[in-house]
Swiss-Prot record:
This is Large ribosomal subunit protein eL34. There is a cross-link at K108 (Glycyl lysine isopeptide (Lys-Gly) (interchain with G-Cter in SUMO2)). Residues 16-28 have a biased composition (Polar residues). One of its GO terms (cellular component) is cytosol. It comes from Vicugna pacos. Pfam families: Ribosomal_L34e.
């Protein structure tokens, strides 16, 4: 005969969100109590590069909700959503773009002064 399973929560169907594991206890002959399994935690990926961020703990979203803000992110620009290397690269790229804009402006001014003479 098939073993009867007893769910502890309201959801009584074998779905992906209702994963359980059997718990054998003495005296439980006709039914087996089940323990609910927690969800697998995934590390937080960066939005540019699929790599793990230098962020706080790697845990379930329910646990993250209970943590304070200081434990969920790193105290720097883009802390918690980008790693330090990507932030450095972003700052360098922005600086070089601004430098290029200035160079173009200076070259235009020189060309106009040459035309005027």
């Amino acid at each position: 005969m098939v073993q009867r399973l007893t769910y502890r929560r309201r959801l009584s169907y074998n779905t992906a969100s209702n994963k359980t594991r059997l718990s054998r206890t003495p005296g439980q002959q006709d039914r087996l109590p089940l323990h609910q399994e927690g969800r697998e935690s995934t590390y937080i990926r960066m939005w540019r590069v699929p790599r793990q961020t230098a962020r706080g703990p790697c845990c379930e979203t329910q646990v993250l909700m209970r943590l304070s803000k200081t434990k969920k992110h790193v105290s720097r620009a883009y802390g918690g959503s980008m790693c330090a290397k990507c932030v450095r690269d972003r700052i360098k790229r922005a600086f070089l773009i601004e430098e290029q804009k200035i160079v173009v402006k200076v070259l235009k001014a020189q060309a106009q002064s040459q035309k005027a003479k």
